């Protein structure tokens, strides 16, 4: 695991001064590291009959699609407003300064489907809590919310269903 962590570079003062940004593009660019990361996460869910993997815009699309392929599941996209072509459900949620909104196609999840929600990073948990609400309202059965990385000092998992959070790497 430590070798995977070493493929993620720190970018100081991005996106603003005082922040150390965990840049996952270096891991994604390395075929062996990317494959290993996806396999390590996917192995947790093999045999659980996941119906769909929900990928959260934008880096969650990369991880979600790769996991869905490995698990033989469909892919559902959660996007910013106005990006999905058919009828959507939307969820507005609070940010540190303001609000944001996410959308999902109304017909993307059927009641009782087993859903894995995937994103690259668990930080404050606000975005994922909004996605959990949407999937729950659509009567999807959330297997887990999975992340490639987690910033544990931000306590994001406190906003998510207890026992339904998995992160491969913690910082």
Swiss-Prot record:
CDD domains: PRTases_typeI. One of its GO terms (cellular component) is cytoplasm. It catalyses: AMP + diphosphate = 5-phospho-alpha-D-ribose 1-diphosphate + adenine. It is an enzyme of class 2 (transferase). It is found in: Cytoplasm. GO terms for molecular function: adenine binding; adenine phosphoribosyltransferase activity; AMP binding. Its EC number is 2.4.2.7. Pathway: Purine metabolism; AMP biosynthesis via salvage pathway; AMP from adenine: step 1/1. Keywords: Cytoplasm, Glycosyltransferase, Purine salvage, Transferase. The keyword Transport does not apply. InterPro entries: Ade_phspho_trans (IPR005764), PRibTrfase_dom (IPR000836), PRTase-like (IPR029057), UPRTase/APRTase (IPR050054). Coiled coil: none annotated. GO terms for biological process: adenine salvage; AMP salvage; purine ribonucleoside salvage. Homodimer. Catalyzes a salvage reaction resulting in the formation of AMP, that is energically less costly than de novo synthesis. Belongs to the purine/pyrimidine phosphoribosyltransferase family. NCBIfam families: apt, PRK02304.1-3, PRK02304.1-5. This is Adenine phosphoribosyltransferase. It comes from Trichlorobacter lovleyi (strain ATCC BAA-1151 / DSM 17278 / SZ).
């Amino acid at each position: 695991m430590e070798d995977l962590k070493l493929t993620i570079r720190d970018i100081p003062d991005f996106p603003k001064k005082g922040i150390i940004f965990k840049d996952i593009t270096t891991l994604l660019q390395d075929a062996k590291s990317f494959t290993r990361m996806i396999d390590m996460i996917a192995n947790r869910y093999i045999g659980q009959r996941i119906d769909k993997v929900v990928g959260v815009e934008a880096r969650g699309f990369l991880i979600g699609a790769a996991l869905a392929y490995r698990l033989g599941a469909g892919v559902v996209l959660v996007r910013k407003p106005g990006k999905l072509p058919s009828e959507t459900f939307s969820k507005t949620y609070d940010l540190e300064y303001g609000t944001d909104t996410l959308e999902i196609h109304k017909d993307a999840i059927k009641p009782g489907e087993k859903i894995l929600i995937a994103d690259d990073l668990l930080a404050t948990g606000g975005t994922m809590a909004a996605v959990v609400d949407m999937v729950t309202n659509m009567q999807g059965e959330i297997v887990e919310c999975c992340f490639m990385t987690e910033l544990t000092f931000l306590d994001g998992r406190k906003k998510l269903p207890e026992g339904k959070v998995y992160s491969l790497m913690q910082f």
